[in-house]
Amino acid sequence: MAPKNHQKYTIKNDIQHVLDCSDVYIGDTAPTARSEWMFDDAVNQIVWRPTTTPEALVRIFVEVLTNAVDNIERSINGGHELCKNIKVDVDLKTGKTSVWNDGQVIPVVKNCDNGVVQPPPPTTEQDRLAYEKLNREYIHTIIFGHFRTSSNYDNETDQVSGKNGVGVKCTNIFSSWFSVVGVDPDRKLKFSQEWRSNMTKSGAPQVVKCALKTGYTLVEYVPDFARFKLKSYPEDVESIFKKLVVDASAFFPNTAFFFNGERTVVKNAVAYAKLYYNLNETAVDSVVIDYKDSKVVVVGSATPLPPVSFVNGQITPAGGQHVTNWSRVIFGALLAALNGKKNVSLTKADIAPYFQLFIHSKVSKPKFDGQNKNCLKSPKVEAHLDATILKKMLKWKIISTIQDKVVKSKEYLALKKIECRRTPIVKVDGYDQANRLGPDSVLIVCEGLSAKSYAVAGIQKGLFNKKGRTYFGILPLRGKFLNVKNTTPLKIGQNKVVSDFIKVLNLKFNLDYRKATNYATLNYGTLLILTDADKDGIHIKGLILNLIHELFPTLFHRQGFIYSMETPIVKILHKKGQPTLFYDENSFEDWRAQHPELKHFKYYKGLGTIGPADVAAFFGSKVVRYHYDEATDAAVNSVFKDENANERKEWLGRFNPRVSQWCLDHHREAVIDLKISDFMHHEMIKFSYEDCRRSLASCIDGFKESQRKIIYAVRKKFRSNSTEFIKVAQLSGYVAEQTDYKHGEQNLCETIVKFAQDFVGANNVQLLEPDGQFGTRLEGGKDSAAPRYIYTKPHKILPYIFREEDDPILEQSSEGEPVHFVPIIPLVLVNGSVGIGTGWSCFVPQYNPLELIRYIEARLTSQDSEALLPAKPWYRNFTGKVAATGPGKFTTFGRMKQVDADTVRVTELPVGMWTDRFKDQCYSLIESGQLQQLVNESTVSKVDFTLKKLQDISALKLTTTLHTTNMVLFDRENVITKYDTIGDILDHYFQTRLAFYKVRKNHTIAQLKNTIQHNETKLKFIEKVLTDHSFLRQDDAAIVSILEKENFLKVDNSYNYLLNISIRSCTATAVEKLQSTIKGLTESLIRVQQTPTRQMWYDELQQLKQVGNWSEP
């Protein structure tokens, strides 16, 4: 059907078509709000900022700049003068914009004289006339003033930015004035021509002679601002244009680029990439990939940016084939590596925001999506990532960020599986659910089943104006509570203790509990933590607070949600009145020092030791309410995050265990408010310190806490009889009974066994004697028999190292155990020490006891002791070699000899390599074809391997390394100290032991004097009885009166020790014996008084050497 209205059809010329359809050629001419990359001179970086500068105004500049940049490649490929300079100038006031370049020049000739064979003339008269006119035009005129003309039409033309024959003509069309100047040094001519009014008016070409030896092309124009709805250039144009010049200078380093007279220097592609990042930001990781015709810079940064890409020097904002292929290769390799290590599947979308790609590809005959050339359509760009570059990238800091943020966020999604719907009954082992669930109910989380019994008894008394099972639920923790900051969500979900805790409270991940509606979904509105009053109890509180901080942080903002119930550690019993309770060990020790008469007190080792009678008095008497403050986040992270280890070292180094920064005993109120940050700094540090006490040895006695408890109990048990063996299992039970040890008797058994081991690499000096299989060098002691089958007793050397004379003056803890022993040789160097504590670890190698004794003897006799410092570690019965191989570094070598051309025999292994491990290593070499045969003739104590046709001796790994760079020990004040050399350790030990002898000497003199006086008084009393027969016929009061008048010595303010003397003690024989005793004591007193302390130590060392019977090093 014909249209009702006639439609008008018009034919537009090329110029009018471009002007009317600008979006087809150069984009929108109207000012529109968008964001654009710009160069900010103030901070010397590329920034992403909003702008209203028309897209088309930028495009017409790009067309001119691209022509100049294309000249770089043309000059190289054409064998012409290289393009050395490109100069851009922009006048914001007048709008005049110019681009100047040298290199390959446009010849100043007419098209017909260009030397190029022209196509046959058109057949129509009109086309023939146009053809002849074009042939009479200069080449400059054709390129810049005629549509669909371009040298790039030539299919042989390679790496340039396009070949539509439009390009720079668009600049001319959208300019009120346009000019081109060209110098041809070969023809010694200079060409110039101007156009006006959107290329509709052109001036005649001007050609003059020119003697310049360097040719150039200069394009200048003034935009037709009216067509862009502007009066002049916007202010940010300069920043936008300069950024485009900087782009080009980055990828063509052999050409100097200038913008408004100033050179834009970008050293390389990496320097260009870093222009996109804040200079104040921590230095980012980067790598450059050069592959075929592409140069790619990959930057690892948490600042998400889209890929920045170029083709032949021209920016491609929408990317294209080159971006797609490089992204696929780079992110594909990263994903394969990351997903291979994790239990979650990452995608490109997960990791791409953490990597910035800068891609520049030189592409032959590129095809774009349009004249704007925003996106490369073809050809396909090849991409490849070398394995060494991938390995480097996997070590970047940003990988840890991805693992922390992206991987964990995905893993936390998996954690949601442990959430449970709110059901009437939550089934968890040992859990007693409150009869009413909701915000008014209280969940008591306690430490094990024994603590549960305390809680069940206590809720009958009640707390928070509630009592009984109506509002109280009880969850006993049955297992290890994880530090959730240093583990994967997968492991968190697999931990039954944590998952039970989450289920019972009905906690939901990513829920904001600051909102009342979300808070009301919890099964309990209050969490009450009930643990033992020891350091492990503090640790459990900290772990629960850490879990909430990491997984449910908004609960910290619910004031009054988290409480802990405290119980006393000591109860003082008085004859009259109420008992005194202490919740802090230091405050108890202070009080005890002021009350030396204290005899009766009860020490509570845990909730299980609190009897039913005490529950009513203790339950709820001290409750701590935890508060979030601005320092909480940093405090929790500093205590629990692995990366804060160095911070914890400083933290522990400042800690004084004898001073409580926060003390419950200073608070009389029932509910005490405590900031979580204060709990971390003042309470958690007690556990961290205690953890180090368990893991790190003392510089003075060489013992960790459990080792010290064992020796204390052994000396106590075998004081009267050291000849009978005892089962290791029985001894561990005795140690646990006699000391304040709470960590399982199995650990004690292992430590007892190690004290008695005598194979190479174990003890240089055994402290316990073995009877049974205590382990061999076959498995490094792991092959010992079960503790119930093996026996031990003190080694004969034990009393010579730990002198009985020392016992009365050893500093004791509140449990009556030594804070540390003071052996007569530095055991920490004799037997070495290895341990890992909170923030600290330690390794001290072993040294020959004879060498250490010689050093001490030299210091005692004021000889040159420095020369006698042990030069290297020493291990008893080790027949290999120990050599210094660097500062603080020693290497131990096994022994091997060549039997014949095909056979070697190994007769010693390096320290720390066990026989069976070496055997397994050799079998692996046989399986891999590096060894033909192994003959094993080793015994439990000797190494003997014969190897046939070994290809590479180094594969045996017959060396181990010992270091003296991490000798971290407790000093005499129990402060964690890192010792740089064994000389430092020896000096600290020597000063301590020598001072100890002075104290011991004074104590011994006082004790001898007291004993002599006591015996002399007894002798005087006996002699009085024997000479005054009427003396005992009087009553007690008269006798006491006489004794007082005659100044008889009282003991404990009485004369009972005299009045209770038996008749047998009053015989002449007894008197003679007592006189002999007094004489012996007096001689001992004189001997002690006359013996210098240094001589005392020296003499005891001689006794030790005789018993030790050690071999020379």
From Swiss-Prot:
Annotated GO MF terms: ATP binding; DNA binding; DNA topoisomerase type II (double strand cut, ATP-hydrolyzing) activity; metal ion binding
InterPro entries (alphabetical): DNA_Topoisomerase_II (IPR050634), HATPase_C_sf (IPR036890), Ribosomal_Su5_D2-typ_SF (IPR020568), Ribsml_uS5_D2-typ_fold_subgr (IPR014721), Topo_IIA (IPR001241), Topo_IIA-like_dom_sf (IPR013760), Topo_IIA_A/C_ab (IPR013758), Topo_IIA_A_a_sf (IPR013757)
Alphabetical keyword list: ATP-binding, DNA-binding, Isomerase, Magnesium, Metal-binding, Nucleotide-binding, Topoisomerase
Topo IIA-type catalytic domain ranges (all copies): 696-1101
Cofactor note: Binds two Mg(2+) per subunit. The magnesium ions form salt bridges with both the protein and the DNA. Can also accept other divalent metal cations, such as Mn(2+) or Ca(2+).
GO biological process terms, semicolon-separated: DNA topological change; sister chromatid segregation
Cofactor needs: Mg(2+); Mn(2+); Ca(2+)
Reaction equations catalysed: ATP-dependent breakage, passage and rejoining of double-stranded DNA
Name of a matching Pfam family: TOPRIM_C
Transition state stabilizer, annotated site positions: 788
EC number annotated for this UniProt entry: 5.6.2.2
Name of the protein this chain belongs to: DNA topoisomerase 2
Organism expressing this protein natively: Invertebrate iridescent virus 3 (IIV-3)
